[in-house]
Amino acid sequence: MGMYPGVLEPSSRGGLPLEEVTLAEVLASSGYLTGMAGKWHLGVGPQGAFLPTNQGFHRFLGIPYSHDQGPCQNMTCFPPATPCHGGCNQGIVPIPLLANLSVEAQPPWLPGLEARYVAFARDLMSDAQRQDRPFFLYYASHHTHYPQFSGKSFTGRSGRGPFGDSLMELDAAVGAIMTAVGDLGLLGETLVIFTADNGPETMRMSRGGCSGLLRCGKGTTFEGGVREPALAFWPGHIAPGVTHELASSLDLMPTLAALSGTSLPNVTLDGFDLSPVLLGTGKSPRKSHFFYPAYPDEIRGVFAVRSGKYKAHFYTQELTTSPGSAHSDTTVDPACHATSPLTAHEPPLLYDLSKDPGENYNLLEGTTEVTPEVLRAMKQLQLLKAQFDAAMKFGPSQMARGQDPSLQICCKPRCTPYPVCCQCPELQPRGH
């Protein structure tokens, strides 16, 4: 689909190609009422061509990209008047809050944003019940991305600073949505999945999160950059417990299609149906996973491969191509730093993640003898990489389509001086 390298910008010409079939489109075709709240970040395009309402969502309330992709030095992140930390991106329009294709505010009042998203979620679920329809809600909160923000009820309450306050509000939002599901009497009919997209941005230090015992963070193919928690809740269907089966966000679409009885598009997908794992009827069909860097190419292919408990790194490099993207700087491990060069490893770095999730002990070096099992695992990982790279076809890069400043969303079209004139700020509510 060409969603590489890096990420889309407010003025990007590219976006998620419309010929790609989304999960929302699959479920909408089966009668689901679909809605999305939060961060989109899959492109805007001319007249909003790539926005959620053109990708299978009946309703959308959110910011079309990351909330740091706009000037934020004059914005309030914590009430009553604590400004956002840092200046974010300059020389572009303030971040817009969209309701479907219309600008609700530019910029929005960030301390009140999560509450608006929760209200949107409640309304979607209530309307679906009133229409006797199933619903699909994609809730992509901005928490705990930099710059952190939170509402009045959470500011200064966590004891963990801005990051903790942001996380506390996210926790409350999830709780409010779950309460709404229960109030509608839908707990036994609703599958809830909670997960995240990448590891901590350790360059932000206390404002970026912590990867704990995992190595490095966002922007790397080490576990600190790619391993995320995942929770699934469905009373009467999913028994409480913990699984160590291998899973990926790529598996969500085939899994939800199977559970909802909907048909998948006739294309090759990288995901697997994980319903046997969720329902306790079998093991994960996913036996391996492949990790690309942020700036992939067809020559090197995937940087790392996992099969079962073993993971091999064939190449390592921090994300350094764009300015300010040294996401894992400030850690003591030099392999995480922006100054870390692209390194081809021959033999590859090999780790047993069941015993060493921190990727500290390379099984192919040191004083201990390399066992036959380890050698077999290494050969298997090399074979998997060769087969995967040979089969992969890179689509045309959407990011390489470049940028057009006129595509930036402005609540006052053709105003001057552009882009600072694009201001339709949301008023601060009383008492906040």
Question: Where are each of the predicted segments found?
Answer:
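Active-site His/acidic residue clusters
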Residues: M75, L101-S102, A121-D165, E201, ...
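Active-site segment of extracytoplasmic enzymes that catalyze sulfate/phosphate-ester chemistry
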Residues: M1-G35, P46-Q47, P52-R59, Q69, ...
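Loop/turn elements at helix/coil->beta-strand transitions in domains of secreted/extracellular proteins
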Residues: S29-G35, Q55-H58, R130-L137, L186-V192, ...
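Active-site rim elements
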Residues: E9-P17, E104-P111, R160-G164, G217-G219, ...
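Histidine-centered active-site microenvironments of extracellular/periplasmic hydrolases
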Residues: G48-G56, P147-S150, T155-S166, A172, ...
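Long, internal low-complexity/basic segments
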Residues: L252, S307, A312, Q317-T320, ...
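Active-site-proximal alpha/beta segments of enzymes that process anionic O-linked groups
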Residues: L16-P46, G70, T76-P79, P83-R133
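C-terminal cap/loop subdomain of S1 sulfatases and analogous C-terminal strand-loop tails that border
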Residues: H58-R59, I63-P71, A81-T82, P200-T221, ...
